[in-house]
Design a protein with these regions (language model features):
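N-terminal export/assembly segments and adjacent metallocofactor-ligating motifs
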Residues: 1-273, 325, 438-440, 484, ...
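Glycine-rich phosphate/diphosphate-binding loops that line cofactor/substrate pockets in enzymes
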Residues: 122-141, 191-200, 309, 330-345, ...
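Extended redox/cofactor-interaction regions of prokaryotic respiratory oxidoreductases
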Residues: 155-223, 227-232, 258, 366-483, ...
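Long, well-ordered, tryptophan-enriched scaffold segments
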Residues: 228, 232, 237-340
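Long, C-terminal catalytic modules of enzymes
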Residues: 512-610, 831-862
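Short conserved beta-strand and strand-loop elements enriched in small hydrophobics
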Residues: 772-782
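Short beta-strand-centered aromatic/proline hotspots
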Residues: 787-791
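Short, solvent-exposed secondary-structure boundary/capping segments
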Residues: 793-806
């Protein structure tokens, strides 16, 4: 029974920890009878986004089933509060259509014929394939491709134990441009704003309702506002976040950097900047621009040169580019300057992920922090590495010595992460093949642009030898796999997660709650699939066992990394893996656990999270330990080096850590961009996006003075494309959905199941007095899609928008492919590379073990837009630039809702056009990539050199 008790000035509805072993509530389904139910409450971590919020699973002691999920108040980031996606985990684990047993293809790929198999058969098959590939020197043909990981470090460790360069991710369709902008400044590839303590907050996002870490961030944004902070939002769309802002700046897509640099100009011209911080903590002395060389010059001379450089970015110029009023730009700039070191901001996807050069707004945004001295400060902008904690396991393999050009091709030497969206095109060009391919939390056929090119690659057994989809549910990509391997949801597996949610370092512990429940009842559990539904396994145990299958006798040197640190020569267990970490790698945890007479592992199983430290401000000023200074040299610029590598910097007379950049300072001037053939962008700059109005005009052959083909690829329309030209925003999120992971959460799709095209009333008139509900046809560079219009003043004129999450589909009516959210479609290849899709029926009620499937009242599954987009790789960051120049017209009589057409021949031509913008490696020293840039599963330094 829920207890409400007063704690200070707040009411608490969460059971106290001391009652988690036997919590009693009345059964709501038995009402009005008072039937008591006894629950074991077990903490875990949500995985319906990357926030890693804490959950409490209520396990019914009588039935042994999970009854519900609520927030964990002991979690430092989410603090007991979760969004709609947290409680929806109950829908996912009880989904009647989920995959419960390992399945093997028995017909042609994509044919939909499957037979149940065993985990042993899976391990033997893949173990033999991978062993042979490694022994024959074909390790680069083994690839692990993950969407959102939900773990820290364990897969990098596994792949490096195998000695391969085989880690691929979805980051370059997610956040690579933002990461690139942050890396250039301070090496850390993500921001960590201290919203709660800020005086002014600037969001280039809809971050109160959606996006990366939005639940813990939204809490702290509101904390900041309650304490008096003002909020500004730059977004072309009137989101719920924008509606809460003190200043809404509906900028035209791709012009954000112009607005931010105009703000920087105001702060510079009015001398409102923190000169001491800039002089001490930027590499201004290395700057060379516009004929100015800082070496030997004064800091004041540098500032005057900087003012001259940014003189063109007047508020009036920014207004002309963006549509944001000049007076609002000036007012916001002065608010930022007044906030000083307590200015916080956030830009992660949005404009960064949508636009060519989307990393430039990040460079400009951090410039505002540098001008105000709000880097690493209370209420300011911090580095993710300062607020994230990744403990090391008992034994770490050496880095691999090979470089996989399917992951990091030489055309994009500065790309932030793997060029994953190009994989079908790279393989089509004959650059390689895949012998063993694992996809995990990864559905590129649906989530990626150009999904039909993925189908063409995945169905070809000469290109992809063996494909396993590690997934809890059927999805569009799994349909083209050889094996579908059921992996657990949030509450069905082990993981460690830590995220930069606020001014703190913490870890969260995901655990399979039914396994923990049965072990508490005294049952011996060897593998997690023994307590999960069906034979649903978990990745940690799968990779341990697969590694033993690859190297059964240890002769390859792989097995040693998966042997117990406590029982030499024996296979490690998950308890041993995490137990060792908690005992040895988490500062303070053993002592905290000891106070409760618990082992560190038992403590984490009890509470689910642990706060490591809140001492996270100004870590650049942290003194270097005396032991680290042995054998070091101080360079003329103050950088402290050891064996030729920077480890710190002199701060006046103190040896301190600094930032992890070549200068050990914030790099206002990027010598890296100069050295790697992009000198024009050495300072934070603005250049026009591929969706700029000039690009629209050029696509029609009209005069376009601002169109620069050196940076902006020309849009070539398919011959049947008609209609008015717009910029399409295809990536805004809905608060209740997340990519395709939430597709089987029935209550989330009851809330949101339609993605109409947002059209401003001014534009609706141009399209022939378009009304809400009218069918429109949206033409892209490679095809079209048909959907309903929604006429709203909540979108900037000249811009249309469509939410990312919806439009799931299945090719057979009875396929168990998330029938709450998918339409049954007729999919045909009508010519070489020419694909047509037509919806036969939308969502319908159906019979299953869940009576709610008969109560489905909605019929709309939305329309799949991503599959009609070509790849747009940014020439520097490698990010897929999501925004599209499109043509919109009223649908024709033969068009139907949900119709899709794509020509993959055109998509490959667009890929080649964008590839031509790149400036390939090698860089200085015959390098493939700057050695100081971060890289997941980083190889040894020697692998960075092109082999002669």
């Amino acid at each position: 029974m829920t207890e409400f008790k007063r704690e200070g000035s707040h009411l608490s509805s969460c059971p106290p920890v001391e009652k988690w072993n036997d919590w009693v509530e009345y059964d709501p389904e038995a009402w009005p009878r008072r039937v008591a139910r006894h629950y074991q409450i077990i903490p875990t971590i949500c995985f319906n986004c990357e926030s890693a919020c804490g959950l409490l699973a209520y396990v019914d002691k009588e039935t042994g089933k999970v009854a519900k999920f609520e927030g964990n108040p002991k979690h430092p980031a989410s603090r007991g509060r979760v969004c709609a996606k947290g409680p929806a985990v109950i829908n996912q684990i009880h989904d009647p259509d989920r995959v419960l047993y390992p399945m093997k293809r028995v017909g042609p790929r994509g044919g939909g014929q499957w037979a149940r198999t065993s985990w042993n058969e899976v391990l033997e098959t893949f173990g033999a394939r991978i062993r042979k590939a490694i022994q024959e020197g074909r390790g680069e043909e083994v690839m692990y491709h993950v969407g959102r990981p939900g773990y820290d470090f364990i897969m990098e460790r596994t792949l490096q134990a195998w000695g391969i360069d085989g880690h691929n991710s979805h980051t370059n369709i997610c956040s690579a441009s933002a990461r690139f902008g942050y890396v250039l400044w301070h090496h850390a590839d993500r921001p960590s704003p201290d919203h709660a303590n800020a005086r002014f907050i600037l969001l280039l996002s809809a971050h109160l309702e959606s996006g990366h870490y939005f639940n813990p961030h939204a809490q702290r944004i509101i904390d900041g506002k309650m304490a008096g902070a003002k909020l500004a939002v730059m977004d072309p769309r009137l989101s719920n976040t924008a509606s809460m802002a003190d200043y809404w700046m509906p900028s035209y897509p791709g012009t954000e950097a112009a607005v931010l640099l105009a703000m920087a100009k105001v702060i510079l011209d009015e001398n409102r900047f923190d000169a001491a911080f800039m002089k001490n903590w930027t590499n201004w002395e290395e700057a060379e621009f516009d004929g100015f060389q800082a070496k030997g010059q004064s800091f004041r001379a540098f500032i005057e040169a900087l003012k001259r450089h940014y003189a063109k970015f007047t508020p009036e110029f920014a207004e002309k580019e963006s549509g944001v009023k000049a007076e609002i730009i000036v007012k916001t700039a002065r608010e930022i300057a007044a906030a000083g070191s307590r200015f916080a901001s956030h830009l992660w996807r949005g404009s960064a992920s949508g636009n060519l050069g989307g990393w430039q707004p990040v460079r400009a945004l951090v410039l505002l922090h540098v001008l105000t001295g709000s880097v690493g400060t209370e209420g300011g902008h911090s580095l993710n590495a300062w607020n994230k904690f990744v403990p090391r396991p008992f034994k770490v393999p050496p880095p691999q010595t090979r470089w996989n050009e399917l992951l990091y091709p030489p055309e994009w030497p500065l790309c932030t992460h793997e060029m994953s969206m190009l994989l079908p095109h790279l393989i089509k060009e004959g650059r390689g093949r895949l012998e063993a391919y694992f996809t995990r939390v990864f559905n590129p056929v649906w989530t990626y642009p150009d999904g039909f090119s993925w189908i063409e690659m995945l169905r070809d057994e000469k290109l992809v030898g063996l494909h396993a989809a590690l997934t809890p549910t059927w999805n569009e990509t799994a349909w083209y796999a050889d094996y579908v391997l059921p992996m657990g949801y949030s509450s069905e597996r082990h993981d460690l997660m830590s995220q930069e949610t606020h001014a703190s370092k913490w870890i969260g512990f995901r655990q399979p709650v039914l396994r923990v429940f049965h072990e508490k009842q005294g049952k011996k559990v060897d593998y997690t699939y023994q307590t999960n539904p069906g034979e649903v396994w978990e990745e940690d145990e799968f990779w341990i066992n697969l590694s033993w299958a690859i190297d059964p006798d240890g002769s390859m040197g792989i097995r040693q990394w998966f042997e117990s640190p406590y029982r030499p020569g024996q296979k490690i267990t998950v308890d041993e893996y995490y137990g060792w970490i908690f005992e040895n790698s988490v500062p303070g945890l053993p002592d905290t656990a000891k106070k409760e007479n618990l082992t560190p592992l038992a403590y984490m199983r009890k509470y689910g999270a642990y706060e490591v430290t809140t001492d996270v401000y100004k870590l650049n000023e942290k003194p270097l330990p005396a032991a680290d200074l042995t054998g070091t040299e101080v360079q003329p610029n103050g950088v402290i080096t050891k064996q030729g590598k920077p480890i710190g910097v002199m701060d006046h007379d103190k040896a301190v850590a600094g930032y992890n950049t070549p200068s050990r300072k914030l790099e206002i001037f990027s010598k890296t961009l100069v050295d790697w053939n992009w000198p024009e962008f050495a300072l934070p700059e603005y250049y026009r996006s591929h969706v700029d109005r000039s690009a629209q005009a050029a696509s029609l052959g009209a005069p376009a003075a601002d169109f620069d083909p050196k940076y902006m690829p020309l849009v070539d329309w398919p011959k049947d494309a008609r209609g008015e030209v717009f910029t399409l925003l295809p990536i805004f999120r809905l608060p209740t959905l997340i990519h395709t992971r939430s597709g089987n959460a029935k209550l989330l799709y009851e809330i949101a199941h339609k993605n109409p095209l947002w059209v401003n009333p001014v534009d609706a008139e141009k399209l022939g007095r378009l009304r809400t509900g009218d069918l429109v046809k949206v033409h892209t560079e490679i095809g079209f899609f048909v959907l309903h219009a929604w006429i709203t003043e909540g979108i900037t004129p000249g811009v249309v928008a469509c939410s990312h999450h919806l439009g799931r589909w299945r090719v057979n009516k009875e396929d168990h492919l998330e029938r709450f959210s998918s339409a049954w479609v007729d999919l045909k290849e009508v010519g070489k590379g020419q694909w047509k899709m037509r919806q036969i029926t939308g969502v319908e009620p159906y019979d299953s073990s869940d009576p709610d499937t008969r109560r489905v009242w909605w019929s709309d599954a939305g329309v799949h837009q991503d599959i009609t987009f070509p790849v747009h790789p940014d020439p520097l960051s490698g990010m897929h630039c999501w925004h599209q120049v499109v043509r919109v017209e009223r649908a024709n009589k033969e068009d139907r809702y949900g119709d899709i057409f794509v020509d993959t021949n055109l998509s490959h031509a667009v890929y080649q056009k964008w590839k031509s913008l790149a400036r390939p490696a090698p860089g200085p020293g015959n390098l493939r990539r700057p050695l100081w840039f971060p890289r997941v599963a980083r190889p040894a330094d020697a692998a960075y050199n092109f082999q002669k």
